């Protein structure tokens, strides 16, 4: 047979193998999609989750612009899901959409591994271990951008494999164009994927150049396809120009405004947050490796390493793709660790950072799937046997089943109404026609969702404290807040006219022109503007506070009656993971029970008043503290300290018939409990010293009684 005949035969054989893998990969991918979609759909939260979900859903519902960089693709597709899905709350529909994104991502990971290795078991390992890790599962069933980002990670890797296997120049050109479009489209969601795009594009161009298929014309075409993928960003200036959305972020009607939003300048273009000092690069890298071992297991990490080691064998196919994927993982991990400026010692910030590790975990899962197939293949070659195929399937099955078993109870969110109840409690507690000055992601995003998407309390006006300091906020949003008077264009402690012509106003002036309405702050008040203090004070209103004119006299009995049962909150204390938004919401609602006694006690400590009135306030605070401390077995640890101090004040006052021995015993008991449960309190030494003194007093009192 001629050499040309051998070449044609090899090409035909390769084409047949690729064809079989392609059809098998599609069938397997569909099966993986169905299985993962079923699990994700079954465990979806029925209402709004925490984090950015409320804001993203509201932006989609209103067709506004989400926080930087805008996420236009997510916004438009979520709006489509809200319109087309005929069941569930608006939040549930977007949660379902994200669950389907996660299932597609799983099928693409399977497809990638199967096409690279020919191993269905390896593909199932990659898809299952990644999808059913706690981190991926948790963020695949919530209305967040991470699930769609996982989809694009899988899609870009699958297209890269497809390009490598393309047999003809025409097919390579077609895949390259589709890939260029998808690269552009992926940047319409989460920008962290640009690090993968910047690895894949040079690799594709190098392959085309090596095969002499890259010309100036083809490069121009690829650029046009990439640019076409960015078209969803047109939504930003259109939405901003129309200004129909009751909630939006930024003014993108100018090029400068568009670039400010697109480049995330309000957060810091290459940073996670504005004005934050984060953990060191080495700390974040070490935490990433530790987190990966927890999420995927050490065995998966080892298999990913094996995928690279097995490249040393001569008969391995597509080694450059394994190196490419490994390079993507390393570059992403190093860059993210460099720019993640959050302190991961704080559980909530750790929860923010770890979401971005999903992007690297997806690559590790693919490498592990390839590694499993490679280890089995090499072992079969050494043993000259095919008897390990069953072991390969058994390993993949065990890994996936273990992931589901380990994480199901944590990720089953079917009954999670925590953020929903938090927002509803805050809104329903408000008087008619009130103004709420929002502060922070938890109250801001959840209340906006309930107010704008679910139509709860349309009489209330929601104004964002932080946003009022931005020059775009009031020009865009004031018309959607008809019941609120703004004495200028921008909130600033220093009133005046800026060079741009904007009129600034302070909080005191804002409150004065809105005296006809009751105004509340949720949660907390902007520290940068203390002007309100000259004519207003903050009175506790559950998790929020009410701004009350100073001329109004505080009536403790009336206020206790108003705020004592302000919320209907039944969640157990401490039942949520500290890094979750559910934990933050639960903490806020529990601490709300303590705010009125704390306020009354503080009033007695600081205000100038007759001793009789002071004693009455101490007694009221003591009664309230005692009631909440003994009402629940588990409660916030600071309640012990506050109650102990209240007992000590009652003891010193001797204004009641209360037994001094009982008060001393209570003071000692709760100071001791507090010191045990909060050993890192800066006042720990003082508390221990006080305990020593109080025990002596108690002993002396008992001795006197005995005599």
From Swiss-Prot:
Just give the chief location class: endoplasmic reticulum
What protein family is recorded? Belongs to the glycosyltransferase 117 (GT117) family.
Changing residue 582 to Q: what effect? In SHDRA; uncertain significance
Give an example GO molecular function.
Answer: dolichyl-phosphate-mannose-protein mannosyltransferase activity
| Protein's name in the database | Protein O-mannosyl-transferase TMEM260
The catalysed reaction is: a di-trans,poly-cis-dolichyl beta-D-mannosyl phosphate + L-seryl-[protein] = 3-O-(alpha-D-mannosyl)-L-seryl-[protein] + a di-trans,poly-cis-dolichyl phosphate + H(+); a di-trans,poly-cis-dolichyl beta-D-mannosyl phosphate + L-threonyl-[protein] = 3-O-(alpha-D-mannosyl)-L-threonyl-[protein] + a di-trans,poly-cis-dolichyl phosphate + H(+)
Recorded source organism is Homo sapiens
Task: Give the highest taxon in the source lineage.
Answer: Eukaryota
Stated consequence of mutating residue 115 to K:
In SHDRA; uncertain significance
One Pfam family per UniProt:
TMEM260-like
- Biological function: O-mannosyl-transferase that transfers mannosyl residues to the hydroxyl group of serine or threonine residues of proteins. Specifically glycosylates the IPT/TIG domain of target proteins, such as MET and MST1R/RON. TMEM260-mediated O-mannosylated residues are composed of single mannose glycans that are not elongated or modified.
| EC code | 2.4.1.109
The residues that cross the membrane are 28-48, 71-91, 94-114, 141-161, 189-209, 222-242, 318-338, 356-376
What membrane topology does this protein have?
Multi-pass membrane protein
- What is any one GO biological process for this UniProt entry? protein maturation
Q: Which disease is it linked to?
A: Structural heart defects and renal anomalies syndrome: An autosomal recessive syndrome characterized by central nervous system, cardiac, renal, and digit abnormalities. Clinical features include ventricular and atrial septal defects, truncus arteriosus, tetralogy of Fallot, partial anomalous pulmonary venous return, renal cysts, renal failure, and generalized edema. Some patients show partial agenesis of corpus callosum.
Compartment(s) where it occurs, according to its Swiss-Prot or TrEMBL record: Endoplasmic reticulum membrane
Kindly indicate whether the keyword Transmembrane belongs to this entry: yes
Q: What class of enzyme is it?
A: transferase
Q: Which gene encodes it?
A: TMEM260
Q: Which residues are glycosylated?
A: 407, 535, 568
Topology, Lumenal side: 377-707
Q: Extract the InterPro entries matched here.
A: GT117_domain-containing, TMEM260-like
Keyword annotations for this protein, in alphabetical order, are:
Disease variant, Endoplasmic reticulum, Glycoprotein, Glycosyltransferase, Membrane, Transferase, Transmembrane, Transmembrane helix
The record's Gene Ontology cellular component field reads:
endoplasmic reticulum membrane
